[in-house]
Structures are given as structure tokens and as C-alpha cells.
Amino acid sequence: MQVTTRTMNKSKHIALVAHDNCKQDLLRWVKEFEDKLEDHTLYATGTTGHLLSKETGLKINCMISGPMGGDQQLGALISESKIDMMIFFWDPLNAVPHDPDVKALLRISAVWNVPVATNRASAKFMITSPLLAEEISIEIPDYEAYLAERIG
């Protein structure tokens, strides 16, 4: 697949997602890095976003709840280059009814080269990276070239 580049601004668009058993862990992480997160535009699936906003006061753009389509909404934003990175604390020990949506969200993140942290350690690496406060370019699929190849 051909690639092109897109620029992430200094202020990032960050998605925050957590399975039910991980919501408190994500909340603790958000509180720990609240000072860094407030400089960015935040998105979250519904239940997670409302919990984080209520407990921290951070402005969060809430989708609907993940099992009701919120994972799909975030995936759409990713495919439109409107999400720069995602913090997704998922529960590897318990299956969820909307597992296909979760897999789709992780797949679309990989397709569009969106960095994803899946636990406190990887999230800490991402949020403390000097790149967080820099304008950077990343490679993404060249959709126009992809479409041209498909339709000739």
C-alpha cells in the first residue's frame, strides 16, 4: 500500500477507552497525568468519558458507550485522521460482548498508524514522551492511491 504523511499538531487529539474492569485504573492514570492531558483535546467512549470528566473536571468529548457503538465512533474518527493517539486499557482476561468492535478499533488504529497504549506502563511512556508536545509527521495510508488502484 502506498503511504502519505499527515501532521499531528502540538496539541494532540487523544482517545481514552477502558473496559469495565479497567476504568478505575484508567481514572488513576488520568489523575496522575491530568496536567499533561489538559493541554490536549480528549475523546472517550461514553461511560468512560463521563466517569473521567466527573472525577477530574477535564473536558472530554464523549461518544456513546463502547458496546452501543462508541468504539465504532472512535474508529471512524481515526479513519478521518481526527485522533492522534489512543490510551485503551482493555481487559485481556475477560471477554466482552462487543469484542468484534474492540478488535476493529485496534485494527483501524494499526491501519492508520495511531499509537495505542494498552496499560499503565505504555501509557506513561506515551504521555511523557517529548514528542507529545511537538508537531510531528506520521505515515498513513494514501487513500486516494488506494481508491485509484481499486477502481482503475
Swiss-Prot record:
Q: What UniProt keywords are attached to this protein's entry? A: Lyase
- Which Pfam families is this protein grouped with? MGS
Locate the residues binding substrate. H19, K23, T45, G46, T47, T48, S65, G66, H98
Please list the residue ranges annotated as the MGS-like domain.
6-152
The record places the active site at D71 (proton donor/acceptor)
Q: Which GO terms describe its biological process?
A: methylglyoxal biosynthetic process
Annotated Gene Ontology cellular components are: cytosol
Query: Signal peptide span per the entry?
Result: none
Which cysteines pair up through disulfides? They are none
EC number per UniProt: 4.2.3.3
**Which reactions does this protein catalyse?**
dihydroxyacetone phosphate = methylglyoxal + phosphate
Q: Which GO terms describe its molecular function?
A: methylglyoxal synthase activity
What protein family does this chain belong to?
Belongs to the methylglyoxal synthase family.
Q: HAMAP family from the xrefs? A: Methylglyoxal_synth
Q: What does this protein do?
A: Catalyzes the formation of methylglyoxal from dihydroxyacetone phosphate.
Name listed for the protein in its UniProt record = Methylglyoxal synthase
* Source organism per UniProt: Photobacterium profundum (strain SS9)
